[in-house]
Structures are given as structure tokens and as C-alpha cells.
A protein has these predicted regions:
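Gram-positive cell-envelope targeting signals
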Residues: 1-57
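Acidic/aromatic-lined carbohydrate-recognition and catalytic surfaces
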Residues: 40-43, 55-248, 256, 267-295
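C-terminal active-site rim and adjoining tail of enzyme catalytic domains
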Residues: 252
Length: 295
């Protein structure tokens, strides 16, 4: 009997425990459901808030919009230098050309560049083109003047300015000016001095009977000519009015074709390093160009 009573109480206790467990489970489930609903509601608000934040321009975007650069007022540009020879070949001859450069303007624009500085593009016997034989043409390896005009048009459509290397400190020794001057010097009798009235081109260069620094001997004569770099690049006499007259025609030629400016090469070597004369030359050149294109 005693055992039966004890067993009955145990059975009642287990039943109560099972009921309590079920009630606890129900309560926990309800609590979890409420929590999940609250979380979903909160998450929805957070997503909506994030979306609103994404729609709003960032502080940097707002600042850039307020400070959109005005190139007309400040003339600052992000410039991309192009060595045409090795840039992009459009015809498969292994040498870059103007058509190839034109094909890649979208790439250059995509970099954020709004100016191109073209290394020398004028006719020259060398690959680098710094020894020029004709200042008013395009080297045939690079294309034609028509190709250049097309390049300028496409650049300006994209608000890309074009500046070209303007090598006026020297020419090639194959330039017609130097060839005429050299032939004239070689024809002079012993003791005779060059006369620009007989050969105007002799005044385009600096000839001397003294072998000073930066001069090379003219083959077959006792005369020397200034050539600060190498003997194949005779230096121009930038103080000559005749040379300045040629430069005036050259700047007009390229500005009329749409060039936006010129880059001058190796100015510290002008006039055999005579700073006073160089400043005079540069002042004259700047005034000359600005009289044709103020910006």
C-alpha cells in the first residue's frame, strides 16, 4: 500500500512536470516569434534608411559638384604625354601613328586627362624626331596632315587640348636650311667671311673658326658650327631676325590647324647657355604666340 501511494504521487508529479514543460515551450516560442517580428520590422527600417543614404550624393560628390574645374579661368590641365612612335599602331607596320592615337582618345579621356602633349611629330631622320627637317609637316611614319586635323577635331570634341613639342633650339643637319648654309661655307675661299646677303641661311646657324665648347667641325672646312647635343643637330641662331621670321610662320601654321599650345625643349641650352639672350628669345616667342592665341 505504501508503495502504491508513493507510485501514485510520482505519476501525478510527472504529469505536472510535463504540463509545465509544454507551457514553457509555448511561452518561449511566442517570445521568439515576437522577437523575430520585431527584428523584421527593425530590419526593414534599416534597409529603407540605407537605401535613402545610397540615393543621397556623398560628401565628396557634393564637393566635386561645387568645385567643378573651369579650365577657361585657371588653365590647369591633367596632361597625358604621348610618344607617338610607340603608343598605338593602327596599320600594322610596327610603329605608332596619329590614327592609332585617335583610336585611343576614349581611353585617355577615361583616365581623366584633358590635355595631350605630343612629343615631336614633324619629319625627321631619327626615331625620336627631335632633329627636324621640316617644321610644317607630319613625319610620314606617323601619318599625314589630314590625320593630324582629324586628331585635333576628335580631341576638341572631348574637351582635350593638344600641345606639341616645338624644337627650336636645333634642326637636323639634313634640314634644307643647314644644308644650304653648309654648302655655302664650304664654297668660301680661304680667308673669306660668310655673307648673309649671299646666303641668308648662313645666319640661321652659328658658325665660327674657333673650336669652342658645344661646337663641331664642318667636314671639309676649318669652320665649326654650334651643336650642343650632337653633330647631327646644329643649333639655330635664335637671335636672328630671319630665324624669328621662320618661327612666326611655323607657330601660325600649327595654331591655324587647331593646336592649343607648344612645349619647348631644352631651353637651358639655347644660345650656348646665354641666359640673357634666352630670356629675350622666350619673351619674344611668348608674345608672338599670345598675339595669335591669347590663352
Amino acid at each position: 500500500m505504501i508503495n502504491n501511494k508513493i507510485g501514485g504521487r510520482n505519476m501525478v508529479g510527472r504529469a505536472v512536470n510535463r504540463l509545465a514543460g509544454r507551457l514553457t515551450a509555448v511561452a518561449l516560442t511566442a517570445a521568439m516569434a515576437v522577437s523575430m517580428l520585431a527584428g523584421c520590422a527593425a530590419g526593414g527600417k534599416n534597409t529603407e534608411t540605407a537605401a535613402k543614404k545610397e540615393d543621397k550624393p556623398s560628401a565628396m560628390e557634393q564637393m566635386n559638384a561645387k568645385n567643378d574645374p573651369n579650365v577657361i579661368q585657371d588653365n590647369y590641365r591633367t596632361c597625358y604625354e604621348v610618344f607617338v612612335y610607340s603608343f598605338f599602331d593602327s596599320d600594322g607596320d610596327g610603329i605608332g601613328d596619329l590614327k592609332g592615337l585617335t583610336e585611343k582618345l576614349d581611353y585617355i579621356e577615361g583616365l581623366g586627362c584633358n590635355e595631350i602633349w605630343m612629343m615631336p611629330i614633324m619629319p625627321s631622320p631619327s626615331y625620336h624626331k627631335y632633329d627636324i627637317t621640316d617644321y610644317m609637316n607630319i613625319d610620314k611614319q606617323y601619318g599625314t596632315l589630314d590625320d593630324f586635323d582629324a586628331l585635333i577635331t576628335e580631341c576638341h570634341k572631348r574637351n582635350i587640348n593638344v600641345i606639341i613639342d616645338f624644337v627650336i633650339n636645333h634642326t637636323s643637319n639634313e634640314h634644307p636650311w643647314f644644308k644650304a648654309a653648309a654648302d655655302y661655307i664650304k664654297s668660301l675661299p680661304d680667308g673669306a667671311e660668310p655673307d648673309p646677303s649671299e646666303c641668308p641661311y648662313v645666319d640661321y646657324y652659328n658658325f665660327s673658326k674657333t673650336n669652342t665648347g658645344g661646337y663641331n667641325q664642318l667636314p671639309g672646312t676649318n669652320w665649326y658650327y654650334e651643336s650642343q647635343f650632337v653633330d647631327s643637330m646644329p643649333d639655330l641662331n635664335l637671335q636672328s631676325e630671319a630665324v624669328r621670321g621662320e618661327i612666326d610662320k611655323i607657330t601660325s601654321f600649327w595654331l591655324d590647324r587647331g593646336v592649343d599650345g607648344f612645349r619647348l625643349d631644352a631651353v637651358i641650352y639655347y644660345n650656348n647657355n646665354n641666359q640673357t639672350e634666352t630670356i629675350d628669345d622666350l619673351t619674344w616667342l611668348v608674345n608672338n604666340v599670345k598675339s595669335k592665341k591669347a590663352d
